[in-house]
């Protein structure tokens, strides 16, 4: 009987993209490690919903900018489940601020979670995967607009731009240690638009796609599953953006 597959999904405690990805993996038969930073009650609610699907679930707190905390989280997941087959890095910070008001602290905040947190989780989980004969799959989450940033997010977009470099670098590093470890990234377009956006801004985001609609967390979950299914894909940073990357509306 093959070993039970285990997925660690960061940022899956809150009802956002991470929890939808966790749901999709649970429906695929994965045991799921739900990560959260401070939202313990929401993480337990997410875990309860996954258990109702028949999945084995654990909740694991960690500040992803803290190397010791990430090491401890990965160690705890391995201690609970015995292995990690999939890591999906969904945890993110996204704050709008005009350039004149951006401080070094703002930049550090975004890089700590979006770049450093992604790296540390992929490093630690990836090295664990490299020690498994079956390897494993890491899926990071960047942002389509790293190539065409827009106003108001000067601290955010650079931190997400780092995710593509991290993805390609760790695809090379981990494959060198075990060719069965693959690392890819998803670059979402307008999915779960921030509530602080005005209706005009939301409509503009939709007009900027070729499909003329907002994406859903389910679209991101589908992309994650496609990376799991195709074992000849690694080092790829895939826009899931309704054509936003290639379209320049007037």
What is each PLM-predicted segment?
Residues 122, 159, 167:
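Active-site helix of classical SDR
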Residues 90-95, 243:
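Conserved NAD(P)H cofactor-binding loop of Rossmann-fold oxidoreductase domains
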Residues 40, 61-73, 104, 218-219:
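The beta1-alpha1 cofactor-binding region of Rossmann-like NAD(H)/NADP(H)-dependent oxidoreductases
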Residues 98-99, 106-108, 205:
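Substrate-binding pocket helix/loop in short-chain dehydrogenase/reductase
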Residues 216-240, 245:
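C-terminal substrate-recognition "lid" of short-chain dehydrogenase/reductases
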Residues 2-33:
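Canonical Rossmann dinucleotide-binding motif of NAD(H)/NADP(H)-dependent dehydrogenases/reductases
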Residues 127, 172-176:
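Alpha-helical segment proximal to the catalytic Tyr-Lys
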